[in-house]
Amino acid sequence: MTDTAARALLRRQLEAHLCSLGYSCVHARRLAPPVPEIARVSPVRGRVAYGETVLRRDLQRRRCHERLLNLSQRRTRRRSTILLFIAVAERDRRDLEALLERLNIQNGIRGGHVHLVTVAPAAAAARTKL
């Protein structure tokens, strides 16, 4: 699968996951760079959630590291945390967890607002056939 197809698949799965959690409204406010791939708002609670997709190649890139670090540290005007959902292929989950720990984004104490959405290869193959 090409990087473009893999990223599109991860993005679709992530958007479906966010919608299932109630984050259905597109966040329309102008965002500071780097702009997240997905920005949604819960219409009930008004809580903001960002979404990013990470491929195996991205795990080695400094730009990806800086992007994840920046998005994980963002706060609302009222200083509350913004949820960050990261879509990753199942085989790359452990590498991403190690990266998040190394960057001090998510460990035993910090990073409760960062959630990993794992996309299984079987689900990926079934979705592309539809």
Model-found features: residue ranges?
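A short helix-loop-beta-strand connector motif used in the catalytic cores of GNAT acetyltransferases and
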Residues: P33-P36, I82
